[in-house]
Amino acid sequence: EGALCGFHAESNAIADFMKQNLLDEGKQDWEFFNKAKPNACEAEAVNRILTFSELLDVPVYFYHLSTKEAVEMVRQAKKRGVKVLAETCGHYLMLTDEKNKGEDGINYLMSPPLRSEEDRIAMWEGLKDGTLSLVTSDNEVFSRKIKEQNLKEDALTNGKIPDFSVPVNGIPGLEERFGLLMIGVNHG
């Protein structure tokens, strides 16, 4: 009694299946990381956890939600009286999956991944209406050198071959997030 269960809500079954399919098709550039963890990956896990929370009358806490589907599920669960708290992170409020494209995409690999503009807006709406209770940092700082350390070398260019499945996930920026968050809050 009195305990609160916290969840990083991503379906490993969906993520593993999607990742393997993409790699089998030779799709390994940074932008495919998001496709390996589609919105359904988070939505399925949130739905499953909310189902048990409601069934067992156990409060739950969701860490760093990133999808419009998950926010809507939490919103509806709260309306039904389910005891649920949820958060998002500054990067899901400020950045989109466009950052995963191109050479610098490796710098924006995180779990859950960055999402679409529609998802980004849904995070702000969730904060505004109280569906989301907190904004956290989930600060995971890894230098580009660390992220690239296990990538294969390209013999022709002496560069690294992109492969979204290899680097550690995480994004720095704790210092900038508070200021960016205040700008967003002031713009409504």
Predicted regions span which residues?
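Glycine-rich, charged/polar anion/phosphate-binding loops
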Residues: V71-V74, E117-M123, S165
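C-terminal helical cap
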Residues: Y108-I121, E125-D129, R177-G188
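Oxyanion-binding "anion nests"
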Residues: W124-E148
